[in-house]
A protein has these predicted regions:
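Residue-level recognition of single "structural anchor" positions
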Residues: 1-348
Length: 348
C-alpha cells in the first residue's frame, strides 16, 4: 500500500502526488504489536495509517475487530460476542458503535447512482428502551438488483415516509416510470406523489389476515392505467404480478441479521442511535459483502452492489473499514487505489 496522505485538510501538500510529503515517524505500541506512525513534511502533523478509520487507536488485532462485526450481522448479540471472544462487553459495544459510524459514511458515499426501475417499500415494528417506546424501520428494495438503498428509523409518520422515498430517489439515476409497490399504509401514496408525482406506476397490495393467515389480497392501482401495469410486469424479470414479496423477504433478512429485532428476547436496543448504527452495518454487509442467491449467474454469485454496478467484487469488512484511507489515496494517486478495493471509481 502506498504511504497515506496527510489527514490535515488545510495542509498545502495534501494532494501533491509528485512530492514526498509524508515520511515515517517511528512506531507506537499496541497489544497486538507495534504500528507505524507518519509525519507530514509540509504541516508537521503526525498521524498513523489508520487515522479516520474504524481501526484508529485500536489496541487489538484488526482480525478480532472484523470478527466482532461479522458476528453482529449474523444475529449474535453483544453479550454472546463478549463470551465467545473473551472481550469485555463495553469493548464490544464501543467497537460496534465505531463500525456503525464507518459503515454509515461508506453507505452515504457509495450507495448512489443506481437505476431504480422496480421498487418496493415496507416498515418493521420494534421498540427501543422499553416496549412502550415503539419505533418503525422503513426500508426499500430495488427488486431487479436486490439493492437495499435506504432506511429510516423513527415514528410511523408522514415525514419519515417522505424521507425514505426522497433519499432513495435522490441517490438513484433518473429513470422513466418506475414501478412502485407498497402495502396500504396511508402515507405511502402521499409520499410517492410528493417525490415523483405522476411520473411512475404506483400500486398498493393490501393483505387481510385472519388467525395469522392471509385470507384476502386486494390490489389497488393508484397511479397508472391497467395496460401500463401489464406492460411493466411483462418487462420485469422478477415479478409476474403486483406483490410485496421482495420487501417482506428483506424484512425477514433484517430480523435474522439484527439481534435487536429478534422477538421475545432481551436483546432490544436501549437507544435509537444504537439501532440505527447496527442497521448501517447490516446494510453495508448485505449490499457489498453477502452474495445473494437470487443473483447467481453460472458459477458467479453477485452481491446487490455488484448487480447494481456500484462495485466490481465482493468487499470484506477490512476493505470497508479502511475505505477512508483508500479515498484519500484516490485523490492523491488516482483511480487505481479505489479500484483495488472493488469500488466504482466515479463514486469513490
Amino acid at each position: 500500500m502506498k504511504k497515506p496522505c496527510c489527514p490535515n485538510t488545510e495542509c498545502p501538500g495534501r494532494h501533491a502526488a509528485e512530492k514526498r510529503t509524508v515520511a515515517p515517524h517511528g512506531f507506537y505500541k499496541t497489544r497486538s504489536g507495534r504500528r507505524r506512525r507518519y509525519r507530514c513534511c509540509e504541516c508537521k502533523t503526525t498521524f498513523c495509517s489508520t487515522r479516520g478509520t474504524a481501526y484508529y487507536r485500536l489496541q487489538y488485532r484488526r482480525e478480532l475487530f472484523d470478527e466482532v462485526a461479522n458476528l453482529s450481522v449474523e444475529g449474535v448479540n453483544k453479550s454472546a460476542i463478549s463470551r465467545v471472544k473473551g472481550i469485555a462487553w463495553n469493548t464490544v459495544h464501543r467497537w460496534l458503535e465505531r463500525a456503525g459510524e464507518c459503515c454509515r459514511g461508506f453507505n452515504d458515499k457509495n450507495l448512489v447512482g443506481y437505476e431504480l426501475s422496480e421498487l418496493q417499500a415496507d416498515e418493521i415494528r420494534t421498540f427501543v428502551g422499553g416496549k412502550q417506546d415503539v419505533v418503525w424501520i422503513f426500508a426499500g428494495i430495488e427488486v431487479g438488483t436486490r439493492l437495499w438503498p435506504s432506511t429510516v428509523v423513527g415514528r410511523r409518520s408522514y415525514q419519515n415516509t417522505l424521507g425514505l422515498f426522497r433519499d432513495m430517489f435522490n441517490r438513484s439515476e433518473s429513470i422513466e416510470n418506475p414501478l412502485i409497490v407498497t402495502d396500504g399504509f396511508e402515507f405511502y401514496g402521499r409520499a410517492v406523489s410528493e417525490v415523483i408525482g405522476k411520473e411512475c406506476l404506483y400500486a398498493q397490495v393490501i393483505k387481510t389476515r385472519r388467525n395469522n393467515r392471509v385470507v384476502k389480497v386486494e390490489v389497488r392501482r393508484e397511479i397508472g392505467s391497467k395496460d401500463e401495469f401489464e406492460k411493466a410486469l411483462l418487462e420485469s424479470e422478477d415479478s409476474e404480478t403486483l406483490n410485496t414479496s421482495f420487501i417482506e423477504r428483506l424484512n425477514l433478512t433484517l430480523r435474522q441479521a439484527t439481534s435487536y429485532l429478534t422477538r421475545r428476547t432481551t436483546c432490544h436496543a436501549r437507544r435509537k442511535e444504537q439501532l440505527e448504527k447496527q442497521l448501517e452495518i447490516v446494510r453495508c454487509y448485505y449490499n457489498f459483502h453477502r452474495a445473494h442467491r437470487a443473483l447467481k449467474f453460472g458459477m458467479e454469485t453477485r452481491t446487490p452492489a455488484m448487480q447494481a454496478g456500484l462495485a466490481n467484487c465482493r468487499l470484506t469488512f477490512r476493505e470497508i473499514f479502511l475505505w477512508l484511507v483508500s479515498l484519500m489515496q484516490y485523490f492523491r494517486f488516482g483511480h487505481s487505489t479505489v479500484i483495488g478495493i472493488g469500488l466504482r471509481p466515479s463514486f469513490a
